[in-house]
Amino acid sequence: MLDVGRHPNIELLVYSEVEKVEGEAGEFKVTVRRRARYVDEDKCTGCGACAEKCPTPVPDAFNEGLGSRKAIYSLFAQGIPSTHTIDTDYCRQFQGKKCGVCQKTCQADAVNFEQEDRIVELQVAAVIIAAGYDVFDPSLIPEYRYQEIPNVVTAIEFERLLSASGPTGGHLDRPSDRAIEAQLEGLEKKAKKSQKALKKLEEKFDETSAAFYKKFKNGAYGEDEDRQKWAEKYEDHLAVVKPMNELKKQAEGFDVAKRLAFIQCVGSRDFRFYPFCSGYCCMHSIKEAIIAHEHEPETTSTIFGMDIRAVGKGFEEYKIRGGSHSNITYVRGRVAEITEGSNHNPVVTYEDTRAREVTSQEFDMVILATACAPTKGIVELAKTVGVELDSYNFIKTSPLSPVDTSTPGIFVCGCAESPMDVPESVAQASSAAERAAELAFQSDIEKEKAVA
């Protein structure tokens, strides 16, 4: 990405949206709306001081909601450019509340709350659509209990947990454990605050809160308003300390997830949703299981699927190595349902077609390999650009020309065309770039003549 950002022949228009495409191959006029960041790209140094001081935490979409960011943020650390952006849906300044902390903090004077959208018009020879994809929402399959059982996560969420730059620093902390730790942290802050208030009263009356409260409950100080308030504060403190101590006992037994289950074809190869194979999921699950084993050698993984489609060069060897070196077990069969056992452990009920039996097994975490779905907004984009979609809402192409769309001069690559893995996406992107270069360097463009 850094090479792209520094390339003299590449202009990046990030945080932008294509509003109109007019013309024909070799002579397109593209209208782009550059959305207001409320941060000047030329002035912002990407130091992050504004985000550090911002008082508004927001669920972090890049980490799939498993962590938090601030209302002023950079999408991720390696993003190009490193300019920050203000999220107006959460920023206190845009919600009618007084704040402006980021503006006061920024030494480069880059924050500008008055910034507006800009319209940019481009003259281009060709257009390449590389809109990517979205993942299938597994909550549409109720038997998998996604978002009901905390330790059932998607493959993308698990990817962020494995990442050293993710919300857990690469440690496989279970979501249920992290939720309890967050709750415990909140209670500890409340307890510390109430303890501070009680300490002042103890110094004032020269008596411990516990000793005073025992006397108070026995009828002493009945009409003393100051001591009544002391008793109320002590009761509030006890109401915090009791659940806090219970959570501390639970947290003592926390450990990283070591028993993992990967469920394949969640939403794909399923006529209720997407009948096609998503292509990359099998190898992605194997890769995640291997990395999890590298993080914690005691980890065991079970991959449930109708079959494992290892179709690329070296893929079958990679699959076998995962089984022999990374404690991966491959189970041929479909998962019927997931229930919640003790300690928030998911219990998977499945059919093993080789053993010809239905059985259940408990795991620390379940990872759902979700289908590759057409990206949100692809229908509107297709209308704007003027290309056709197939029956699944991927960009329609010809089998003999897999990067050419229905409109000459407009090309497509990657998962905007169909589900595919990274090597295939790169190969198709190279093909689309070559086709676009033909138009860019062609002096005379032949136009089709109308035939009566």
Which residue ranges define each predicted feature?
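Residues forming the flavin
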Residues: M1-K189, K193-K199, K242-A452
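Extended, charge-rich alpha-helical interface modules
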Residues: E188-A239, P243
